[in-house]
């Protein structure tokens, strides 16, 4: 598992400090003695380090700490900057990269407070003292009056708060999202208090009371669409007495059931009059309907509890707002609507398709208003490629509302729509220049616009239409007419659910406005969205292509012409009485309205207002309400619909096909009854309401009763919020990392528990394990087999390597005999004597002969018997055992013949350092001769006799006086003190001079033969390795795992302080430990990812991909694995120390002579492990279990291991078959496939060779998330892609692991990256032809896929057979690699979880690209982070650098920011900020590479004071992992 650390910083910052090598324990420094050990002591041959190495490691740790401190300081500084400027977006980016809010802010940046004019001050003063509706022309500065009023209210509010009064806030209400952005930007530029802006698309309907309370506490002004405040009031998130000012923008909308009117009726008028907020309304005209002007205006005053006011000095206003010159453009009478040739073809064949009816109606009407050319071209929009999925989905939805599955007639209709699209694509459209193709109305517009735009001009024009289609078609037409200086654009409203190609986003609206301001567009074809409130810059030509219907439309659209010399043109049909009457009507109405407003006396009292209010409320009282007393939250007929929608959406996480409330309204006895149907998982499924006279009333009544029922069942809380939550997984932000560099002290087993079993008793039977030696070349002397006898049978151990003589590689083979050896007490005595004699003669240890305390016995093997004999007794050399039992040593007097002294093992009884093998008699030397000069110096160098003799000074004199000075001098081989034969000799050990000359009399001749003694000298290394195997197997047994010994030990072996840091100078390397866990951990990590992915997939059918990722993260994170390992005490089985000459001796014996190592054993029973190491061992055990196989399936034991180490109910499988048995087939999978799905299955089988039993699975695998599930009727591919991703990882890792047994995990990871990269998988998707089957709902995506497919196919054609052609192309759209992974997931599930299906796919379609992996050696190095690391390390020779990342958390719903920094010698050379650690690090690396681009090594070292070239070794770049 990659390391991950998240730390708190300054109370609100989480930093990430990654892959930091562990710091040394500076308080426990080791001192290495270089002097000769004192007489009589065993010396240590361990060379674990020196002072220079410790100093180097201390420096590395210090550098890491300094870098971490530097980064945390930087992160804190940047966090303050980011949070302090959170309300001020970065505006220096191109418009295309800015958010909508930033676009608005950029346009208003620098627009400071304007000087109020006299009429504005006049209205402001009136608004301070009473509720006021300001009626002023568009462009006269109504918003500025609102700003002045807000400043006044806020000032008083701050005073009230200081005096202890409850806080109140101001609301600026708007009628559209567009205005919310615009007005919020204006207020932020003019107020010094926090201003928030909200609209429905932000998901405010799902916010909790706590979220709202936070917003109310932190903002003085809130700009929002009116329905948001209405819902807050009804849900009692805020009360009317907590509001000090209500500003209604475009106040003329306050009528009927508009949210403005409902706020007044349902909340404002119900509040205590003394606690109501001030009201300020703004409008260009107080009415927007036809009828009695005075009556409508008076009613508006009543509804808003306000007085209409305008300036008493209209001349001042006219100086500011100049009226445009009004013109009437007359066009000839239009022809009646008629059917064009294309219309006739489509009507005849497809006129019965309901989804196309709106298009038929428009095109028929357009033939008259716009002309046949525009009418026909409308079909190109309606049946474009990006619209077809919408139409198809609409057909499916309608069909399935009647029956399920989709009937064949619906499928046929879908096919017919596609056929219609093909007809339109192949249709030859006439040129608009052909006579008769354009209507007289359009021809006139063309002529007029040519006059304005045929020469260079500063004219800016807006052409208003009533219909979105008309604006779009005019834009399309004038884009092709080639009027020299006309730059057309289109601005239409946002409408959800538009299925005929007219939909736009808020962002597209703003971009159009931005381009209009800048002049990039100078003629805007717009609908009413451009009439009202939008701050469109001055333009000098406004054309009403379609006439206004009301006074407000006339006033608003005329107000767009603000230039000093503007023209306002109304296009009217010649001889059309209705058009002429409308012109007169609006002008007279405007005069009457102005007269009414201007003649209002200042102190006028609105007579009859109480009765008017009563009549308003009476209509509401006829409708029921339901109030929750605890909070005051109110349920009304209108709010019930929103509450039910919110409740239904809260069940979305249950993966409903359609998480929405369904209303079915049916006629009944001259009235209507509505049935409410809630999503399937709702405990209350709905009800049927009471009859009502209108459909809308029936629907509201049923919704109201349903909400009451939900409340009764406690499914709605005290604020009418659902008790369910469409929640993000609870652990999405959990701190699941552990500190990779933190070390703790843990107990460590030094001996297996096997040795303690039955210890203290004399055995009657023993089990034999024969130990043999197979050298790679002849040794200097024979090494005879020995037998290890134990109370219990030992497992079969793998062979392993030791290094004998001068590093001759020798294989140690152990063979465990099945049958037990029954022994007598005499035989046990022989065995005990021999074992104790080995410790005495060979290792200078004298133990009390207590055979019951021995954990094992060592015996010589019989050389004459076959190794295959199963009888342990016949394998043992009992004659030699008897000889050794009877003779403690061989007296030299028994061998008067000098030849008898040759090929003996002799030892110094006083000094354990001196053991020899005798080789020859040297007749040229005598005992009295001085030792040859090449011999190592000893204390006494007077003679060879004196050189050989050890012992005290007094004993020496006596011995020398009586010894035989005529005895021969023997040439011998000094046995090295080296005990760790598991590793090759160190240089120090090689430098030891082993040739020596001694006299035999001061020494003892061992009764143990030379060939047995030679084998016994290897016994410490052998028993150390066997101990390690046994301890590792015990560790596996604690998890109930049956693992092969070699893999078990490898999984538990950590041979350095930083084993997990590959290709890095290893710290405190432990020699001779064999393979460490890193490769197994890499393999286990991959299997863990796959196993948990499968388990989550089968156990949680309702979870989405995000749930899967978060839940898998919780399972596989180092923190979880560490906690499991801690609980099961796996740390004690971990082998973190190499061979120790102190701990190999058996426990429990009584030492009589020799160095006592018990203190050393106690000290070495603890070891320091990083927390990450403990977690890594868990993954390595999974890898070991995988290699060990299973009883029925190769993965069985690994599955069991995953369950053991994750310790979670989310993974309970004990074998592979448990996955299949746990999987409940979802309904969509088992439903009968339709014709499309059967055809898809056949085509994909032809391409890939696998036949799906459930074609709907394949359908799901190829369904993009953009494709509406209600249309597709199968889930999108995200769940299957999640599963397939892990399967692909596993099959690729498995292939590399076995093909390259000697490659380290970093190499394997880097080359796996190529195999699973999006770049390769995208190319593979195109190669296999899968891209043509993707079902999506995105026009840009279609274009991206087409362009990529063309590029990758061209690259393959030009590659001349090279398999890496995909490397040179651009990255594919992500949907293509996702398709491949989803296909694998689908095939895997379809095959009942047969991994063979994944392997077959890999062998057939993937393996051929990766036979030669050297091609991809540089693949990973192209990554900016890897490239930076290589440059710093290899080119500059620098090792003191790091790349760190830290996350700055924000409030719920906010955008996460992550800062990454490259630090070189405590200097931050580059930074990058992004939404994730991964991309932040890429940005920081790219910037760092840019900084270093032309910098040579000398300049680098001078600039950053780098002296790393003088240091030993290199350290890794601290790159960590993505947050």
Curated annotation (Swiss-Prot):
Binding-site residues for ATP, renumbered to this chain: 136-143
Keyword Repeat assigned: yes
Gene Ontology CC entries for this record: cytoplasm; nucleus
GO molecular function: ATP binding; DNA binding; helicase activity; metal ion binding; ribonuclease III activity; RNA binding
Keyword annotations of the record: Antiviral defense, Antiviral protein, ATP-binding, Helicase, Hydrolase, Magnesium, Manganese, Metal-binding, Nucleotide-binding, Repeat, RNA-binding, Zinc
Positions that bind Mg(2+): 1281, 1378, 1381
One GO term (biological process): regulation of defense response to virus
Amino acid composition bias (Polar residues), ranges on this chain: 24-38
Motif DEAH box positions after renumbering to this chain: 249-252
Start and end residues of each Helicase C-terminal domain: 444-617
UniProt region (Disordered), positions on chain: 24-58
All copies of domain Dicer dsRNA-binding fold, residue ranges: 640-730
Span of domain Helicase ATP-binding: 123-304
Residue span, DRBM domain: 1426-1494
Keyword Phosphoprotein applies: no
InterPro entries referenced in this protein's UniProt entry, alphabetically: Dicer_dimer_sf, Dicer_dimerisation_dom, DSRM_2, Helicase/UvrB_N, Helicase_ATP-bd, Helicase_C-like, P-loop_NTPase, PAZ_dom
Residues in RNase III domain copies: 1031-1190, 1241-1392
Residue ranges constituting the PAZ domain according to the UniProt record: 879-1007
Family that this chain belongs to: Belongs to the helicase family. Dicer subfamily.
Primary role: Dicer-like endonuclease involved in cleaving double-stranded RNA in the RNA interference (RNAi) pathway. Produces 21 to 25 bp dsRNAs (siRNAs) which target the selective destruction of homologous RNAs leading to sequence-specific suppression of gene expression, called post-transcriptional gene silencing (PTGS). Part of a broad host defense response against viral infection and transposons.
Protein's recorded name: Dicer-like protein 1
Source species of the chain: Aspergillus oryzae (strain ATCC 42149 / RIB 40) (Yellow koji mold)
